[in-house]
Amino acid sequence: MESITISQLKNWKINKKKFAAITAYDFSFSRLFSNCGIPVILIGDSLGMTIQGHTSTLPVKIEDIAYHTKAVRKGAPNTFLISDLPFMSYYDTKQALKNTAKIIRSGANMIKMEGGKWLIEIIRELSNRLILICGHIGLIPQSFHYLGGYKVQGRKENDANKLIDEALLLEESGINMLILECIPEKLAKKITESLSIPVIGIGSGKNTDGQILVMHDLLGITEGKTPSFTKNFLSESDSIQKAIQKYIYEVEHSIYPSKKHSF
């Protein structure tokens, strides 16, 4: 696979070519995903739960993300890598710049931050320094206490309008990509069509430019109850490779997510 760039992802949006993304945290899985043709990998702070065994993403530190980014880059040299800035690692511009440098040096193409209007100044400073930025709105796990738990966001009209306004403001301020998590399908469609940057959905219906899943959910190895928007692709396949290929196919052909995976 040739190196994936932000320009290529933007062209896919223009040409309405959907793409599949996935989380990964180590060399072996990132190499497998890359060999299957996954173009985008997120080194997510979800590792706090899937790798470290915590009950939330909040304990994850910047050093954890840097370590796992290095491992993933070795396994996926040509894949577009997005790395999370974890909780309280970007509380002001100085801290954001310092920690972004750590992550980019570790091999990421892009950093991701959760939040809306309060991030504008930080986004502008990073963008002025030519750093690629992915925004993340809707259900933002780093703020699940404030949100009252892991709930669908944007169901009410005023909440939906707020998310639309935030998405437009984030793009205007300099983000290069946006993740929408757990919002109604119609709202995600409207936001996706309103932005010129690629929009990736998780639990937000099929009308975004791309889809992302946590690898453990996709492979059916998450213990306990999983979110309703996830799908166990391994249960329908006889190998991990075939499960990933099925995931890619279903995303590219708008089969997944179906209505039962959407809100």
UniProtKB/Swiss-Prot annotation:
Cofactor mode of binding and number, as noted: Binds 1 Mg(2+) ion per subunit.
Keywords, alphabetical: Cytoplasm, Magnesium, Metal-binding, Pantothenate biosynthesis, Transferase
Example of a GO cellular component annotation carried by this entry: cytoplasm
One BP term from GO: pantothenate biosynthetic process
Pfam families, A to Z: Pantoate_transf
Pathway assigned to this chain's UniProt record: Cofactor biosynthesis; (R)-pantothenate biosynthesis; (R)-pantoate from 3-methyl-2-oxobutanoate: step 1/2
InterPro entries named in the record: Pantoate_hydroxy_MeTrfase, Pyrv/PenolPyrv_kinase-like_dom, Pyrv_kinase-like_dom_sf
Residues the record lists as binding Mg(2+): 45, 84, 114
Entry cofactors: Mg(2+)
Localization in the cell: Cytoplasm
Positions with a binding annotation for 3-methyl-2-oxobutanoate: 45-46, 84, 112
Catalytic reactions on record: 3-methyl-2-oxobutanoate + (6R)-5,10-methylene-5,6,7,8-tetrahydrofolate + H2O = 2-dehydropantoate + (6S)-5,6,7,8-tetrahydrofolate
Coiled coil ranges: none
EC numbers: 2.1.2.11
GO MF annotations in UniProt: 3-methyl-2-oxobutanoate hydroxymethyltransferase activity; magnesium ion binding
Active-site residues, Swiss-Prot/TrEMBL: 181
Family note: Belongs to the PanB family.
Subunit description: Homodecamer; pentamer of dimers.
Task of the protein: Catalyzes the reversible reaction in which hydroxymethyl group from 5,10-methylenetetrahydrofolate is transferred onto alpha-ketoisovalerate to form ketopantoate.
Protein's recorded name: 3-methyl-2-oxobutanoate hydroxymethyltransferase
